[in-house]
Amino acid sequence: MRLIQAQTAIYVTAIFAVLISSCVRATELAIANFNNQAMHWTWGDYQYSTGPTQTRIYDPVDSTGGAGRSLGNLNLSSLADARWVVDFTKNAGNGSNNFSITLADSSDRRGTWTFNTTGVVTGTPTTMVSTTTLDSPTGGTDQANLDLSHISFFQIDGEWSNPNPFDFSFDNLKLSTEVAPPSPYPGYEADAPWRAEAAARIDAIRKADFNIHVTDATGRPVSGATVDVAMQQHEFGFGSAVTASRLRDNNLANAVYKQKVEQLFNIATLENDLKWPAWVGEWGSGFTQAGALAAVDWLQANDIDVRGHNIIWPGYSNLPNSLKQILDSAPLDASEQAALRAAINNRIDDIASRFAGKLSAWDVVNEPWDNHDVMDNLPEGNAAMADWFERVRANDPTAVLYLNDYNILSTGGATNTAKQQFYYDTLATLKNSGAPLGGIGFQGHFNESSLTGPEQVWEILDRFEALGLDMQITEFDFGTEDEQLQAAYTRDFLTAIFAHEGMDDFVMWGFWENAHWWPDAAMFRSDWSIKPNGEAYMDLVFDQWWTDETLASDAQGLAAIRGFKGKYLITVTLNGETVVVPATLTDGGLELAIALPVLAGDFDGDGKVDGRDFLVWQRNPGVGDLADWQANYGLSITTDLSSSVVPEPTALLLATITLLLSSKRNSFW
């Protein structure tokens, strides 16, 4: 790597020198070489020790904290497109999954760049490059306005809230415009080994054998029939959060939105309408109970399962004003605690009973790691959640009841964080208490610094699968301006989820830029043009993982295929006669018998097996045809067969209508 010699040596502090390019644009800048150089401060009980080539930064208790140095008033504006390059060694005893470089400007705005070290070998000198450039920090405080021309200090920070020790030795820290960007996440490469394993898993767990047996009206096998196997809907749930106000009426302005929902998804979550403040009218006229009910009815009418989100979000800021007024009196006395419990019970009774039988799932409690004000003000603490689950079940006997939280998968590859452990322990405690907990919700909100590789996703899911509960991705999105990276990770994350046996559904947290809390994460732009991540979704869900084939029945009347599990329409045609049959392919496969209103041996198609058919056969003899003619000679569709072997016209008509109306695969997009 080339280092342009500086015309003048500029010393940021007395401890280390910074070299600056004589050109307009610097290509490399040394920030610290850590050779017998002290840190200027530590925080969070961190310690450091210096050496001739390294500075060890550590905390034997936990990973929250860091150490920093002053930079005076350093101008880094010429290095806006540079990346961090850090040389370090992970020491024995380290339990942290990452560290971050933090820069602060003269106004104390801060930007951070996080380095995922989960795959780093202990004791091995390692060089890592930041995934983003200096002008694109992945976190911080008002980082979008970080003033690179007035940088006052840098810090090396540990992993927030990780209870394990932090222990790294740092050799060099510099900025470079010439270094190649790193792989954005483990497994990004086109030839990454996990891809073959995912394909094998998907074939094993998401597909099944489908054997279609075609017979004539007498039950004899029919060869040469055309068998169209047309998938209509996945068994696996692919869905999105949706806006009730766009579904609840016939406003033409929402026609495209509704059309997309109907075509693209078989499961949906009302994003905001069932949240407690919205439900009781505190969020304005755009949220009504009647509108929420109408939206759920519309989704059900279009064969889309509905998730309820959420019943209790137990943080102060997410509660209605009536609950806030109670909590404002904290610490609560016994009567106030009783009032708090009564308010929660009334909330559960109201909303759970209103939607009983309409929802496939409920997020009963949302984000308990960060939201626990209600539990903190009750003597039973987190045990109160078990009572809430019991009360929801009493009001709704069918919905699967979920706990839901974020930053379980979006960890930058970390597989054993404090939050993951808390979530696992909370789920296990609820289950062991006998609470009717049925599912685990993984939200999945990602940015460029929190991308977790597919194999790490599997490792995390394997751990939670051991609890024996349903598992869903409940709120996936990836917000970034890099649309190609967004598409690549959407493809790979969705593939990893579909390839994991414990996963049942994949729900995004919005799909259209004009109806998304994080517009950059949407699949469709405001003008409904599709983005690369949307194309990745379509390619997987409606092409690579979609079964739509045309077969021909063999001499035994068999048309066999291995298809993706879900709903199908099977269309069998021979000699101008057609039968359409709905079918569902699921675990264990399916043996489907379809009788055509024809007679084997009726080679001229006139509904009778007679001498004329023998003459036709003589001109074009086929294997088994003579036996068919002999077996059915003298029979007639109209006079000699019971009508029970011929599909009723009404059934055929209904199946055809279903074919036209229910297909989820459409060229509209």
Can you name each region flagged by the protein language model?
Residues 267-282, 290-409:
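Substrate-binding cleft and catalytic face of glycoside hydrolase catalytic domains
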Residues 178-247, 276-283, 307, 326-332, ...:
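Beta-strand-rich domain onsets/edges
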Residues 55-142, 150, 163-169, 174-176:
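Extracellular ligand-binding interfaces
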Residues 30-61:
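Extracellular glycan-recognition surfaces and repeat-rich motifs
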Residues 650-666:
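A cross-kingdom C-terminal cell-surface attachment/processing module
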Residues 185-189, 340, 354, 363-382, ...:
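Aromatic-rich peripheral "rim/lid" segments of glycoside hydrolase catalytic domains that contact
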Residues 6-18, 23-28, 596-609, 623, ...:
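Short, threonine-centered small-residue motifs that mark membrane-proximal processing/anchoring sites
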Residues 155-163:
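Short beta-strand-plus-loop segments that form exposed binding edges in beta-rich domains
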